[in-house]
């Protein structure tokens, strides 16, 4: 049996055991070590891959699933008209090259992102900025590059900084007051900020007409989530995806921009382009996504305008998954949420006591990557899991730690 087949069998077995909910503790040290080694060989990285120095100073970098300062607290039930929760209790990320020759994905995490982005901007300009009270919002993003990694890496460096600038400008301009009108205005401001951010970053990385042809053929999808105490804002451009688990139900927060999506096909054709079925539906027979950052040579058919979803948080919100199509091409929303939920609720911790992080968001992300590999994903695979409230009780955690 080949090593690839053996690896897929081990991953599939692990996933089946978690789905079955088998809580019996066996002698698993060897298999656990083997799974860890397999992930390392595949090039596993955790949320520390967000290499921005400012972000590292703001958030813990010692654990791939770094808990926030509120991670030891159970998210409170809403007690007022405008409910507030911790932005997140933990987050984790895994990004692997998979069966591709080159790594073109990039991920970024900054929590809280406004403070991290402010520090990065001040360092870049050399100008000191007054301290201000920023809302505790986390920034999470997956960028799936194509034609090379240049644009995805540029998005990782710039997207959160530009978005923070756009958000601050609109908050400075907003008026006082309260009520439904203000809430609606705030939603509109978030959509405007996201749209302006994507346009600016696209302008920075898209390449000019006189630029080298190679630079014009590089692009990246982008799915970005800003998680705050009151709401979740998701902006998507391309076929990466964001899915929320709410009360055990998978709720998509984005819609893939595929060339054969009826409204996207109509838009492309109205701009003078064509959607050709050449090894799958593609813009001009070339690109399998109808929106992206970069890809100057395919404009105006391929645009960088994101679709933005602004959703109020509830006490049923459990976790958020952001991932590239390396996961979504082989795993459905429902299955992904079931796997992550079982992991975060403690089933994986009792089954795999030597797990690197102990049934945290990073473990959930790693298990989803294993599942995608076992199902034959041929792409880079990047997964970010954001835990919004504790699914595992303190009693369960104490028993496991004292075992």
UniProtKB/Swiss-Prot annotation:
CDD domains (UniProt xref): PP2Cc
Swiss-Prot/TrEMBL GO biological process terms: regulation of intracellular signal transduction
Catalysed transformations (reactions)? O-phospho-L-seryl-[protein] + H2O = L-seryl-[protein] + phosphate; O-phospho-L-threonyl-[protein] + H2O = L-threonyl-[protein] + phosphate
What is the name attached to this protein's record? Probable protein phosphatase 2C 8
For bias kind Low complexity, which ranges apply?
Answer: 62-71
Q: Which organism is it from?
A: Oryza sativa subsp. japonica (Rice)
Q: How is the cofactor bound?
A: Binds 2 magnesium or manganese ions per subunit.
Recorded hits in Pfam families, A to Z, give: PP2C (PF00481)
The record, for InterPro entries, names: PP2C, PP2C_BS, PPM-type-like_dom_sf, PPM-type_phosphatase-like_dom
Enzyme Commission number(s): 3.1.3.16
Similarity-based family: Belongs to the PP2C family.
Sequence positions that bind Mn(2+) 2: 144, 325, 379
Mind listing the UniProt keywords for this protein, alphabetically?
Answer: Hydrolase, Magnesium, Manganese, Metal-binding, Protein phosphatase
Required co-factor(s) are: Mg(2+); Mn(2+)
A GO molecular function annotation here is: protein serine/threonine phosphatase activity
Listed binding positions for Mn(2+) 1 are 144-145
User: SUPFAM superfamilies per the record?
Assistant: PP2C-like (SSF81606)
Every copy of the PPM-type phosphatase domain together lies at 90-388
Instruction: Please give the residue ranges the record annotates as the region Disordered.
Output: 42-80
Q: Broadest EC class?
A: hydrolase
> Highest taxon of the source?
Eukaryota
């Amino acid at each position: 049996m080949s090593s690839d087949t053996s690896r897929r069998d081990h991953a599939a077995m692990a996933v089946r055991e978690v789905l079955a909910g088998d809580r019996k503790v066996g002698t698993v040290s060897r298999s656990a070590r083997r799974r860890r080694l397999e992930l390392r060989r595949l090039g596993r990285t955790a949320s520390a891959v967000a290499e921005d120095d400012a972000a590292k100073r703001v958030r813990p970098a010692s654990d791939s699933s770094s808990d926030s300062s509120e991670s030891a607290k159970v998210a409170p039930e809403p007690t007022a008209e405008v409910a507030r929760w911790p932005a997140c209790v933990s987050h984790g990320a895994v990004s692997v090259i998979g069966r591709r020759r080159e790594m073109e994905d990039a991920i970024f995490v900054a929590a809280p992102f406004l403070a991290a982005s402010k520090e990065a901007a001040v360092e870049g300009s050399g100008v000191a900025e007054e301290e201000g009270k920023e809302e505790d919002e986390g920034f999470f993003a997956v960028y799936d590059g194509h034609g090379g990694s240049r644009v995805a890496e540029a998005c990782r460096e710039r997207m959160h900084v530009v978005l923070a600038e756009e958000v601050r400008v609109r908050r400075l301009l907003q008026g006082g007051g309260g009520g439904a009108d203000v809430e609606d205005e705030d939603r509109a401001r978030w959509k405007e900020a996201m749209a302006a951010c994507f346009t600016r970053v696209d302008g920075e990385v898209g390449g000019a007409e006189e630029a080298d042809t190679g630079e014009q053929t590089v692009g990246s999808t982008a799915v970005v989530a800003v998680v705050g105490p009151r709401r979740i804002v998701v902006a998507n451009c391309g076929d990466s995806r964001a899915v929320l688990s709410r009360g055990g139900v998978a709720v998509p927060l984005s819609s893939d921009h595929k060339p054969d999506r009826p409204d996207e096909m109509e838009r492309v054709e109205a701009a003078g382009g064509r959607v050709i079925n050449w090894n799958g539906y593609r813009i001009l027979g070339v690109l399998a996504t109808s929106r992206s950052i970069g890809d100057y040579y395919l404009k105006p058919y391929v645009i960088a305008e994101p679709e933005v979803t602004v959703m109020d948080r509830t006490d049923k919100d459990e976790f958020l998954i952001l991932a590239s199509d390396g996961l979504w091409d082989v795993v459905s929303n429902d299955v992904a949420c079931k796997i992550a939920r079982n992991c975060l609720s403690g089933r994986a911790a009792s089954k795999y006591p030597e797990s690197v992080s102990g049934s945290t968001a990073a473990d959930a992300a790693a298990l989803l990557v294993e599942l995608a590999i076992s199902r034959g994903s041929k792409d880079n695979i990047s997964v970010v899991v954001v835990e919004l409230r504790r699914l595992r009780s303190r009693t369960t955690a104490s028993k496991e730690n004292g075992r």
